Regions:
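Glycine-rich phosphate-binding active-site loops on the catalytic face of alpha/beta enzymes
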Residues: 98-104, 137-146, 183-203
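Glycine-rich beta-to-alpha transition loops that act as phosphate-gripper elements at the mouths
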Residues: 26-29, 75-81, 97-101, 117-122, ...
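Glycine-enriched alpha-helix->loop->beta-strand junction motifs that scaffold or abut catalytic
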Residues: 41-46, 67-70, 89-95, 109-116, ...
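Shared catalytic-loop signature of beta/alpha-barrel
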Residues: 127, 143, 147-171
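Catalytic cores of alpha/beta
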Residues: 36, 80-90, 123-131, 154, ...
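Histidine/lysine/aspartate-rich catalytic loop segments that bind and position anionic ligands
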Residues: 103-105, 109-144
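Conserved N-terminal beta1-alpha1 strand-loop-helix module at the mouth
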Residues: 1-90, 110, 180, 200-218
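Short catalytic-loop micro-motif centered on adjacent basic/acidic residues
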Residues: 47-50, 74, 95, 137-138, ...
Length: 219
């Protein structure tokens, strides 16, 4: 029988599979978050991963969740149980991490949070699966060997129904190649909202990248 944690994680994978591309965002203020949120909603890309790499992350998640309820907002770079709780208290629908931390996974299970730990080896897949994880972040995707490595990691576990979200080096050029893998639910991408573009308020550049990503994902 599936746990509530597993059901929520599978639901997240299925929801993100509809959206396909998840912008990975480093935001320094609520104002930045609301502007990027407006762009995402207007262009029809209804997901975002707000990374806990800045002190503003929690308030950004809260503000964006309230302003744009249609956005499926998650928290990224969740490295400890405190950030995990803060993310969901702020309104995050899911959370992901770059690595596999059993303590954080167990906290997610206990609290029925939708959480995808990061993996890049078969050993990590097995450890995550043993704890009940059904949705995993493959990170750092390109540096770890890219599409061929991900396919090799997936191969022994196809029968388990695990879904993956590759992130790290995913770009406009290779996103659809990753998405062509049946076990890949979605890809995470920093190219859609580069920190420099956000800080310099290059909103038109971000809008064009988002628009192109939506177009490409529908091919």
């Amino acid at each position: 029988m599936m746990s509530c944690f597993q059901k929520k994680s599978i639901a997240t994978a299925e929801k993100l599979a509809e959206i396909k591309i998840v912008p990975v965002l480093v935001l320094n203020s609520v104002e930045e978050g609301l502007k990027v949120g407006e762009i995402l909603v207007s262009e029809g890309l209804l997901a975002a991963e707000i990374t806990f790499r800045t002190v503003a992350a929690e308030s950004v998640i809260k503000a964006m969740s309230e302003k744009f309820p249609e956005l499926y907002i998650g928290a990224g770079t969740v490295l400890n149980t405190d950030d995990l709780k803060r993310a969901f208290d702020a309104g995050a629908k899911f959370a992901v991490a770059p690595g596999f931390n059993p303590t954080v996974v167990k906290s997610a299970i206990e609290n029925s949070y939708s959480f995808a730990p990061g993996i890049c080896t078969p050993s990590e897949v097995e450890q995550a699966y043993e704890l009940g994880c059904k949705f995993l972040k493959f990170f750092p995707a390109e540096a770890a060997g890219g599409i061929s490595m991900l396919k090799s990691v997936i191969a022994p576990y196809k029968h388990l129904g695990i879904r993956f979200m590759p992130t790290g080096g995913v770009s406009e050029a290779n996103a659809n190649d990753y998405l062509s893998i049946p076990e890949v639910a979605a890809v995470g991408g920093t190219w859609l909202g580069k920190p420099t573009d956000i800080v310099e308020e290059n909103w038109d550049a971000i809008r064009e990248k988002v628009r192109q990503a939506v177009f490409n994902s529908r091919k």
